[in-house]
């Protein structure tokens, strides 16, 4: 029972999603090969990054305890129900953070460790705090969310180059419509706790247009790995097809569906699209 509650505190769904994007960066660097040569490194970087993301989620839960208790979708989180105390969560998060640093420092490379630490700082120190203050918090959070594929890539090549930037942009532009779709779906919860989310402050109509704008940027960014010569023709075709398909379905829903159906459409296909792109990268 306690294991389940501690696992819930680390938000395994977020960890899993980020590890998929990390895999995309790793595959781009190895040209879709994870044989015996790269398998140990792949396992180590996955573990190290997973621990850091888990630590970030734990500290996010600690800071958000007060607003989580007022929102329907978060009111059963362990800190809200009292199954785990703030002190226990702080110790847990600190242990995860230390373990992550040890794994990445000793078993991966220092560059990847620093990149992941930056992502942690942005998520916990900037995004978590700023989402109570500004409508731009989602964009700031997009920075931390775009870090895992860069970490996966640098773990192999040990350098920050244009390919790393391309991976960052793909995930950054993907995250904005994905996150705003969630904001639209749970807008009533966010209104309860007075969070200045874009759909609340600027309205649904404006938010939908912004989502399509970032979606268009995402489609363009998907061509970058091939343009830079790091991705092959197969990867380029798959990436562009699924990105354009997401764009098409979103525009179609924008024109014909209700706001909620539009948000569900964007969210549903965002998961499918990023998974396919990351697993065929290389």
Curated annotation (Swiss-Prot):
The keyword Transferase applies. The keyword Transcription regulation does not apply. Pathway: Porphyrin-containing compound metabolism; heme O biosynthesis; heme O from protoheme: step 1/1. It comes from the Bacteria. The chain crosses the membrane at residues 9-29, 39-59, 79-99, 102-122, 139-159, 165-185, 210-230, 231-251, 261-281. Its EC number is 2.5.1.141. Keywords: Cell inner membrane, Cell membrane, Heme biosynthesis, Membrane, Transferase, Transmembrane, Transmembrane helix. CDD domains: PT_UbiA_Cox10. GO terms for molecular function: protoheme IX farnesyltransferase activity. One of its GO terms (biological process) is heme O biosynthetic process. It catalyses: heme b + (2E,6E)-farnesyl diphosphate + H2O = Fe(II)-heme o + diphosphate. It is found in: Cell inner membrane. Coiled coil: none annotated. One of its GO terms (cellular component) is plasma membrane. It is a multi-pass membrane protein. Converts heme B (protoheme IX) to heme O by substitution of the vinyl group on carbon 2 of heme B porphyrin ring with a hydroxyethyl farnesyl side group. Carbon 2 of the heme B porphyrin ring is defined according to the Fischer nomenclature. Belongs to the UbiA prenyltransferase family. Protoheme IX farnesyltransferase subfamily. This is Protoheme IX farnesyltransferase. It comes from Francisella tularensis subsp. tularensis (strain SCHU S4 / Schu 4). The gene is cyoE.
